[in-house]
Each structure stands twice: as structure tokens, then as C-alpha cells.
């Protein structure tokens, strides 16, 4: 990289995208301790008494009159469960009992048979993670651990025991009750994991067809969900402001379109301030409680390095979220269209770490740090944002615009479904720093499922040209991309790293922003 101080006079040429380099461990698997090479345990037999309970509420009457007198009436189960049992045959190298949807995903994943045989548990981990509907929140609250002892890995999918709770306080039990959803018709490479519940509503759980009582239980759950949605809408009405946003804001100009809504710029009539307004169609939001959570969190998070929430309105089923507008666009435009020097990268990393230190101090994990979610002001200000509500501002013709929410920035402990905390954001920041160097994250050209496998088994990715980076920058990256979470730097610690002392003034980003805008105009 060049430290050319004349950047303002002549912006550098846009970088040419190169294929991702896959890190090789020379046969050594950093996560071998977590993913045993032995065959997975055999499928445990179902317990007989379960069928007796089913017969009680399924309408069977043979020989049941006497028993009905002896025992109280048993209601249908409130949490019907469709358990998946998957095994692996080390001799044939084939999985047994794998759901058809998973098998299809695996066939198109480009994970080789050798890789599957080498680490079958890692394959199951990433399949379950990729197909899980628990990856649904972007801003998440977390509880600081009282003890250092967390589970070292996820249990095998055919284990009967319950999984130890993660540090993150999200309801992960729900996904254990649902079978893998049907593969969406759109290409997997463009699918957003974080917005999967918005783009592809998860189908109802698949139960045993002969259990009428279970079907009734599912109907009961659906009614309960509908009632909960009504309660959520009522709660939302107590949070938003009263009024018509079309009267308070004028000069609406569409700048983005997403799966469940649209992003506009507009002008505040009273203040003359330009704002960004996200118009969200709540009918396309199956998890409306997440919207309440995000609004409440954003209302509390006021920080110079976070795009500020301004107001919200509810008009019918349309939610309008008003946010601070930054005209410089996303960092993605800069990293894909220009070349950044180390001092400019240091400036961006410092600003993002300041935002993360604030979030983590308030027990919030962002969990989606990437260049797409870093917005720039024309004067060079750097702010974290989250457009997970509905739309992405990046133009649709851009290759990167389809990659929002994909797994390339995820920390290994997230992919392998271990307990995790705020340091997942630090890993993602390290991946974003690689973006600023190379124009893309590692494994971008891989199938998303194989990318997850490589993250889980390879760990720290390798740079394409590490010799071009200064030792101090490489050390910063190593601190961010440390596999051992305990050794990985925190936001507070990394703010003291010598690399950040190299940072140029934020105004040095303005020429890059201008150059990126010009390059994007010429590409249209």
C-alpha cells in the first residue's frame, strides 16, 4: 500500500478484485479439538412411554376408559418437537439420517467428500447454523459471563442432551422445534442469513402425520402467535410518535429498495435537516418483536460513531423509521472502488472501535460489522449503522449489494454455535480491515456454506499479500482475528494499539469518497 500524501490531487485507481485465498494449515486443523474425527454417535431409540402419551390425546379410545378414571386428563403438548438425528459412517464417508433439505444444501456447497470425512461435525455445525432461523437479530443484548467456563463446542445433532445456553440472550430453543426450511429458489450466494426470516418465511414445523393431537397443538400455537402479533403491534403504537411523516418530512427521494421496504432521503420541514427514512412493510416482517427491540435499543444508543435514530411513525401496516443521513455512502463503495492506505484504514478502525466500545459497554453486540454497515459523511465522519430493518442503500447492480448478511464476516465461535460474547464484533472488524486492504473479505468467491466450513476449520484467514503490510498492521489484524476468544483483543484494548496512532485525519477520507462516487457514476 502507498502512503502517498498527494491523494487529494489524484484519487487512486479502483482495485481489481482478486479471488479469495484459502488458508492452508498443512493438514493441521485448528479446531480439531472441537470437531472429533470419530464417527458421530448412533441414533438413540425413542422411548416407548411417549407413544402412550400420544394415544391419550390423539383420540384413541380402545381400552382407555379405565385409564381415564385413574389419571387426570392430559392436554396436548405445548412445545411439539421434530427432532433431527444425523449420523456419519466413517467407512462409507456418508451421512445417515440427514434431512433432504440439508442433503441438497450439502450437494451444492462445494464441500468435498474428503473435507466431509475429515470433519463431519463441522459440516453438521455449519449446516445447522446456515439453515437455522435463530440468526435473526442484528443488535443483540448480551449478559457478561460470571464464569470463564463456556462449552467448548456444540453437541452432535443426534445427542439427546440439551445445549448449554450461549452468552447471547436470544431464544434459540425455537429453531430446535423446526425442520430445516425448504431451499429458496433464489441463489444461495445472494441470500442474507440475518434477514432470512424476512426474505424467506420459515415454514411450519413438520410433525408426524398420524398424530392428530400434535396437529391440534400446532394450530393452537399458530393462534397464539397471531395474538402475540396483535400485542406486538399494540406495543409498537406506544413506542412510535403520533403523526403523519409525509407532513413532517418533504422532498422524498428513493435511494434504496429491500426485501421488506424502501429507503428514502427527505427533509425535515421544521429544521430543514436532511434525513434517511426507512419505510417498512410490517406484513413482510414475521418477527415483529425484533423491530420493537431494535427501536428501543437505538433510542438509547446515542454516540458520535453510531448513525443516530431520530424518530418513528406507524401508518397502518407501514412503519417509518427516521435516521440520521450520511451523504458519503457506505464504506463498501470506498473499499471496492479505491485503494486505501494504512493510515486511512487505521482512522476507520479507530472510529469503529470507539463505536464498539460504547456498544459493548452497554451490553449490546452488533453482530454484523462489515463495510456495508459503516456509513461515511462527506467530511470523513465514520459511523456504524444497521439497515437490517428493510433495505440496503447500496445500488442493486453492485455485486456487493447482494452480499449483505452473508457469513464471510462471522467469527468461528458463531459459525460453530458455541457460546459467544462481544468479541465476535472484533473478529468481524478484522475481516473488514482485510476488506479495506483487498477490496473483499476472505472466501467471498466461495459458496456461503463452504465459506462457513472454512471459517470453522481453517480459522484465521490468510492475506493475499501479507508482505505488503507493515508489521504493526499485521499485529493489529492478528489481535482481531485471534481464534482463542480469551486472547482476542477487546474494543477497549485495541483502541490502545500502536497501529491506530498511525491514523490520518478523517478529512483524508473525503478524496476517497469523492473518487468512489465518480467511479460508480462511470460504471452505470
Swiss-Prot record:
Which controlled-vocabulary keywords does the entry list?
Acetylation, Allosteric enzyme, Apoptosis, ATP-binding, Cytoplasm, Disease variant, Growth regulation, Host-virus interaction, Kinase, Lipoprotein, Membrane, Myristate, Nucleotide-binding, Nucleus, Phosphoprotein, Serine/threonine-protein kinase, Transferase, Ubl conjugation
GO BP annotations, alphabetical order:
adherens junction assembly; apoptotic process; bicellular tight junction assembly; cardiac muscle hypertrophy; cell migration; cellular response to starvation; cellular response to transforming growth factor beta stimulus; dendritic spine development
UniProt modified residues of type N-acetylserine: 2
> What is the catalytic activity of this protein?
L-seryl-[protein] + ATP = O-phospho-L-seryl-[protein] + ADP + H(+); L-threonyl-[protein] + ATP = O-phospho-L-threonyl-[protein] + ADP + H(+)
Q: List the disulfide bonds.
A: none
Q: Where is this region: Disordered?
A: 1-81, 143-164, 169-188
Site annotation (Cleavage): which residues?
212-213
Give the regulation of activity.
Answer: Activated by binding small G proteins. Binding of GTP-bound CDC42 or RAC1 to the autoregulatory region releases monomers from the autoinhibited dimer, enables phosphorylation of Thr-402 and allows the kinase domain to adopt an active structure. Following caspase cleavage, autophosphorylated PAK-2p34 is constitutively active.
Kindly identify the residues recorded as the active site.
Answer: 367
CRIB domain span: 74-87
Residues recorded as bearing N6-acetyllysine in the entry: 62, 128
Q: What class of enzyme is it?
A: transferase
Kindly state the positions of the motif Nuclear localization signal in this protein. Answer: 245-251
Write out the similarity annotation.
Answer: Belongs to the protein kinase superfamily. STE Ser/Thr protein kinase family. STE20 subfamily.
Q: What is this protein called?
A: Serine/threonine-protein kinase PAK 2
Provide the species name. Homo sapiens (Human)
Q: Which gene is annotated as encoding this protein in its UniProt record?
A: PAK2
